[in-house]
């Protein structure tokens, strides 16, 4: 595969992931991740296999940095990894992610831990907004 073909494939996969996320995840959830930018590229996943991916720059309550969603075409599933703002991977790759669970998984990694009640989330969001307001003064 030529360099141009690889770039085209990476963009195609990134657009596919974005479409699947927007089709399966509430827009308010997507907005809560504080996506500041996105891109397409290639990354070596948990098995060392090079895969096309979507790269999101996020600023959520739980994670600020990069989220990489890579398509494992051989298994037809996604692999997800988090990176801090310095570019260091945070934790292990999460594999075997299907498209129907991708949005909720990303939300639990970026913005809202699994099991958190709506009331706790609202309180945490309000506190985070208050702190950000203080820091801007």
Give a label for each model feature.
Residues 60-62, 73-75:
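A generic beta-sheet turn/junction motif
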Residues 54, 68-71, 77:
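Eukaryotic intrinsically disordered, low-complexity regulatory linkers and tails enriched in Ser/Thr/Pro
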Residues 2-11, 87-137:
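Mixed-charge, Lys/Arg-enriched low-complexity segments
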Residues 2-61:
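Negatively charged, low-complexity tracts enriched in Asp/Glu with abundant Ser/Thr
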Residues 74-87:
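Short, surface-exposed beta-strand/strand-loop-strand elements in extracellular ectodomains
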Residues 63-67:
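Short, surface-exposed coil-to-beta transition loops
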